[in-house]
Every structure is written in structure tokens, then in C-alpha cells.
A protein has these predicted regions:
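A short N-terminal helical cap/helix-turn-helix that marks the beginning
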Residues: 1-18
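Surface-exposed loop/turn positions
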Residues: 52, 76, 158-159
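Conserved pre-ATP/AMP-binding loop-to-beta segment of ANL
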Residues: 15-16, 147-165, 172
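Structural core segment of the AMP-binding/adenylate-forming
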Residues: 8-9, 45-46, 73-142
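Conserved AMP-binding A3 loop
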Residues: 28-30, 161-180
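Conserved S/T- and glycine-rich ATP-binding loop of Class I adenylate-forming
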Residues: 54, 71, 102, 160, ...
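Conserved AMP-binding/adenylate-forming core of the ANL superfamily
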Residues: 18-61, 65-69, 86-91, 139-142
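Short, conserved catalytic or interaction motifs in soluble domains
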Residues: 59, 83, 178
């Protein structure tokens, strides 16, 4: 079973049912699946290939849920970044994971000024917020709006879906792998 199977099953069983409701934005499972599919397609358009790492630095929201499903849908590996990390730790997680794309919300956009020159593998930064993205970032909504739907990539249940970092109590944080 792949992570995308959860969304596909929800659309089959209750497509018109509520999938998410956050700060006045509501969507049913059919709408949610459409956005997840198009975000996955948009990530592929940025060059994300199976196994590529896509990091997420944002607070919980309906959009976080979208990219939690869209990254493995695209064949990528999601790397959630702890929102309480200091800039040097964020740099370590991004570089150690080899993240090529970073999805970042308004709450953390300012931290990029402190870390930008230290990121080794990052190619694209996607602003997940309302309004125009800061300079040098792509718009999350434009990425979705400009992409066509796509079927989930058949990566197989034993393929890597996520990379979660430990607390680092015995040294630097280490990535722990989660398969589909």
C-alpha cells in the first residue's frame, strides 16, 4: 500500500465528504485529491524525480496536508523540518537530506536570509503563503494552478516515502527512513 492510496480510497468512499477545513478554507476529498495531484505534477515540473528529497518548513495547515501527500505522489521523499530548529540545525537537515526543493510558509520565510548561502543541494524554494512570494521564491498556488493532474507514480510499497530526523540526543540529528 502506498501513501497515495489513502487519498484515492477517500475519494472512492466519500469524495464529497470534508477532507480539510482550515482558517475558512474547506475542501472535499475530490477537491483535495485534485490539488494533491496537481501539486505532485508541479513538483515533477520542478525536476523532482523518484527518490528526490522535498523538505517542508511550515506550521500545520491544510496546505501542509496537501504537500504531505503530494510529495510521495510525485515519487519524491518528504522531509519535514522541525519548526523549532535554529538556523544552523535547519541547514544541517537540508544538507544532510539532500533536499532539492523546500516548501516554506510565511512564518519561516525570513529565516532564509540567514541560511541561503549555506544550502548545498537546494534548487527551488516554494512559498506556501497567501499573496505574492518573496523574491527568489516560487508561488505555491501558481505551481498548483499551472500543473495538470497526474496519477501517483508507482514507486512500490517498499520505496522510501519520508525522511524524519531524530532529536539528536547522542550527537547530530540523523534521518530515519519511512517506506510507503
Amino acid at each position: 500500500m502506498r501513501i497515495s492510496s489513502i487519498v484515492n480510497r477517500a475519494t472512492q468512499v466519500n469524495g464529497a465528504g470534508l477532507a480539510s477545513n482550515f482558517q475558512g478554507r474547506s475542501q472535499n476529498w475530490n477537491q483535495f485529491a485534485n490539488r494533491v495531484s496537481r501539486l505532485a505534477s508541479g513538483l515533477c515540473g520542478l525536476g523532482v524525480k523518484p527518490g528526490d528529497r522535498v523538505a517542508m518548513l511550515s506550521l500545520n495547515s491544510d496546505r501542509y496536508l496537501e504537500y504531505f501527500f503530494a510529495v510521495p505522489w510525485s515519487g519524491g521523499v518528504f522531509v519535514p523540518i522541525n519548526t523549532r530548529l535554529a538556523p544552523p540545525e535547519i541547514v544541517h537537515w537540508l544538507n544532510d537530506s539532500g533536499a532539492s526543493v523546500l516548501l516554506i510558509d510565511d512564518n519561516f520565510a525570513a529565516v532564509l536570509d540567514k541560511i541561503q548561502g549555506q544550502l548545498e543541494s537546494l534548487k527551488s524554494i516554494v512559498h506556501v503563503g497567501d499573496g505574492a512570494p518573496p523574491e527568489g521564491m516560487l508561488s505555491y498556488e501558481a505551481l498548483i494552478d499551472g500543473a495538470a493532474e497526474m496519477a501517483p507514480l508507482d514507486t512500490g510499497g517498499d520505496q522510501l516515502a519520508g525522511l524524519f530526523y531524530t532529536g539528536g540526543t547522542t550527537g547530530r540529528s540523523k534521518g530515519v527512513m519511512l517506506s510507503h
